[in-house]
Amino acid sequence: MHGNIINIEDVILDLVPQPEIDLRCYEQLDYEQFDSSDEDETDNMRDQQARQAGQEVCYRIEAQCCMCNSIVQLAVQSSRQNVRVLEQMLMEDVSLVCHQCAAQ
């Protein structure tokens, strides 16, 4: 539009049909290169980097306080197998307590 007064002639509506776009993906994956385990992709990358460096990996763990249900965060450095053991313990008979409940 040009000027201070709005005219219908100033509004140009030219609708030009776009060529049809193919939105399908023709990518093919080689499923043999992927294993069917339940591990997260980021865990795999982190483990690969740690194995290459010959180090253990640092994991961040979040769980609820068993007394007040607030979030408790831990950072542990361990192997993947030992973190799985800790995860199993937290799901069964080990509970975490936040610092406020522990002080009472």
UniProtKB/Swiss-Prot annotation:
Biological process, per Gene Ontology: DNA-templated transcription; symbiont-mediated perturbation of host cell cycle G1/S transition checkpoint; symbiont-mediated suppression of host innate immune response; symbiont-mediated suppression of host type I interferon-mediated signaling pathway
Q: Which InterPro entries match?
A: Papilloma_E7
Q: Which of UniProt's keywords are assigned here? A: Activator, DNA-binding, Early protein, G1/S host cell cycle checkpoint dysregulation by virus, Host cytoplasm, Host nucleus, Host-virus interaction, Inhibition of host innate immune response by virus, Inhibition of host interferon signaling pathway by virus, Interferon antiviral system evasion, Metal-binding, Modulation of host cell cycle by virus, Oncogene, Transcription, Transcription regulation, Viral immunoevasion, Zinc, Zinc-finger
Its post-translational modification remark reads:
Highly phosphorylated.
Zinc finger (unnamed) boundaries: 65-101
Please report any disulfide bonds recorded for this protein chain, giving both cysteine positions.
none
SUPFAM superfamilies from the UniProt entry:
E7 C-terminal domain-like (SSF161234)
Output the Gene3D superfamilies linked to this UniProt entry: 3.30.160.330
Name the Pfam families on file.
E7 (PF00527)
Q: In terms of one coarse class, where is the protein primarily found?
A: host cell
Q: Where in the cell is it found?
A: Host cytoplasm; Host nucleus
Q: Which domain of life is it from?
A: Viruses
Molecular functions per Gene Ontology: DNA binding; DNA-binding transcription factor activity; protein domain specific binding; zinc ion binding
Q: Where is this motif: Nuclear export signal?
A: 83-91
Subunit text: Homodimer. Homooligomer. Interacts with host RB1; this interaction induces dissociation of RB1-E2F1 complex thereby disrupting RB1 activity. Interacts with host EP300; this interaction represses EP300 transcriptional activity. Interacts with protein E2; this interaction inhibits E7 oncogenic activity. Interacts with host TMEM173/STING; this interaction impairs the ability of TMEM173/STING to sense cytosolic DNA and promote the production of type I interferon (IFN-alpha and IFN-beta).
**Protein task:** Plays a role in viral genome replication by driving entry of quiescent cells into the cell cycle. Stimulation of progression from G1 to S phase allows the virus to efficiently use the cellular DNA replicating machinery to achieve viral genome replication. E7 protein has both transforming and trans-activating activities. Induces the disassembly of the E2F1 transcription factor from RB1, with subsequent transcriptional activation of E2F1-regulated S-phase genes. Interferes with host histone deacetylation mediated by HDAC1 and HDAC2, leading to transcription activation.
**What does its UniProt record remark on the domains?**
The E7 terminal domain is an intrinsically disordered domain, whose flexibility and conformational transitions confer target adaptability to the oncoprotein. It allows adaptation to a variety of protein targets and exposes the PEST degradation sequence that regulates its turnover in the cell.
**Can you name this protein?**
Protein E7
Q: What is the lineage of its organism?
A: Viruses, Monodnaviria, Shotokuvirae, Cossaviricota, Papovaviricetes
